[in-house]
Structures are given as structure tokens and as C-alpha cells.
Curated annotation (Swiss-Prot):
Can catalyze the hydrolysis of ATP in the presence of single-stranded DNA, the ATP-dependent uptake of single-stranded DNA by duplex DNA, and the ATP-dependent hybridization of homologous single-stranded DNAs. It interacts with LexA causing its activation and leading to its autocatalytic cleavage. This is Protein RecA. One of its GO terms (molecular function) is ATP binding. PROSITE patterns: RECA_1, RECA_2, RECA_3. It comes from Bacillus anthracis. It is found in: Cytoplasm. GO terms for cellular component: cytosol. It holds the Pfam family RecA_C. It comes from the Bacteria. Belongs to the RecA family. SUPFAM superfamilies: P-loop containing nucleoside triphosphate hydrolases, RecA protein, C-terminal domain. Transmembrane segments: none annotated. Keywords: ATP-binding, Cytoplasm, DNA damage, DNA recombination, DNA repair, DNA-binding, Nucleotide-binding, SOS response. Its main location: cytoplasm.
Amino acid sequence: MSDRQAALDMALKQIEKQFGKGSIMKLGEQAERKVSTVSSGSLALDVALGVGGYPRGRIIEIYGPESSGKTTVSLHAIAEVQRQGGQAAFIDAEHAMDPVYAQKLGVNIDELLLSQPDTGEQGLEIAEALVRSGAVDIIVIDSVAALVPKAEIEGDMGDSHVGLQARLMSQALRKLSGAINKSKTIAIFINQIREKVGVMFGNPETTPGGRALKFYSTVRLEVRRAEQLKQGNDIVGNKTKVKVVKNKVAPPFRVAEVDIMYGEGISREGEILDMASELDIVQKSGAWYSYNEERLGQGRENSKQFLKENTDLREEIAFFIREHHGISEDSGAEGMEDPNLLD
């Protein structure tokens, strides 16, 4: 046995010398290690994700119908990474990035790396180069459906290109997944929804780009509008449901309900008020909301406005919500500058 053990030790040393420390290890060595995360920018979504945010070094897919809030959810994640001193990149394949809206959500547009590629191959190669640099903490690709293969762009309008985009995504993800894990980059792929023709039973909806992204994603989020939010006769936003359809780091199928206000993004006050009411941190009596016997306001909108004006009180309530769910603030802030600190 000792000869076999010595041979194994020598082989392990050779592997580590050739491929670097940590390239092979015993499974139990990392059993105690927590998943390093970065907040999604939404407290309700952090709780639904189960680990306090998006796991670093993993692939996330965010999909849903048009104008459901997919890009808004992604921009909040970028703003959170930048707030913690990290570097962010946005691959705008749809050529629809609105810098004014991004700025309102808290994104530092002077520091955000932006690329608007001509072809799908170009967009994915740029993403790979940024990930392999090890200096980017989050990269958002908007969207998979807009990553059109070069052959399709150069071909005629009626030409058939069956499975071309699926093959492109499959090859790209095979190359990207290892680099994403090593660099601790959060890679968010935004995707659209398509209808499968002739489906009689089950869900006819599917996402473009083949099956590869479904397999490689650690987390898949489905974003859908639930109802409109009105102030008088004016529509001021949407109540949006974000369902965690797949989760490899915590139990899946949890749902986060958030208010996405037009021109403002996710309402922090709205989600804090709803979650605190559920946990009885904030008491609701009739139409009145109160906290520690102090009245916040009559009706939800007035209470939201009160919390918006009193940020110290808002963050105090948020602290108790985090404490209840066992989530620490800025859980991924440490090591944001240097991914090697997490190795």
C-alpha cells in the first residue's frame, strides 16, 4: 500500500506542477467551503437564490417574455458589483443599451465596458477574452437570441441555417465554462422566449440557442410581469415575479416578487416593506404600516415613500430581514479586486 500511496503522491505533485495548485484535490477538502456570492441588487432575489446572491465563477441564465425586466435585473447586478469595487462588462448584441436608464439604476457608465458586436462569434470571442483576463467580475450578454452566427448574417434572407446558433452556443460554453470558474467571473446570459410549434401538452415555450445553456447554467431565472402598478390613473411600474427555475447551489423553485418602477428599476423600499410585513418585522393594521410602534404611512405607496426618505430606518429593517434569512451584506465584497484570494 505504501508504494501505491507514494506513486499517487508523486502523480499528484506532477499534476499540480504542470497544471497549477488546486487542479486536483480530495473532495472532502472543499466540503466546508461556502459559495462566494455577489448580491443581485435585490434583497428579495438574494433570499430566493438561497445563498445571498449570484454565485461567483458560475453561469446564470435570465429569460422571460419581452419587456419583463430581464435587462433591469442584470443592470442591478452590474451596479452592485461596481459598488463593491469590481469591474463589469456588457456585451450588447441587441444594440439596445440605454445608458441614461443604466445610470438611474446605479451603474457607473464611465467604468462599464461595453461591446456591440457585429456577429455572434465576435461577441462570444470578446466575452472569452474578458473572462480569461481574470480582471472582470461580471459579464452580461444581452441576448443569446441576438448572437447571430456569421454565416447567417452573410447569407441571403431566405436561407435555412438549422441548428447553427445552437452549435455556436454549445462550442462557446464548452470553452467558456472552465475559464469562468477559474476567474470567478459571474457570466449572465439574457435570453428570450420562443413558442414550439405543434405542442399539444406541456409548456410550448422554449429558449433559443439550443440546450447547452440550460445544462451549463448554475442558476436559471424566469422573469415575468405579474400586474401593473398604478398611481391614480397613471401606470408607474410593474409587479414582477422572478422564479428560480434551476439552482445548483441551493434549493430551486423559490419566487421573488419585486416592483420594477419605470425609470427607477427595482424598488428597494417595496421589497423591504413586503418581506418585513411577512416576517412581522413591520406590522400592518388595516391600511397602516408601522415599525416599533412608529407609523410608516397609510397604504403601501405612502409607506414606500416614507422608507425612501428615511434610509437609516429602511436599512435597519433590511438588516433584520437579512438576519432572519442568514444572509450577510456584501457577502462577495471580499476578494472582489483579486480572484486569487478566493482560491
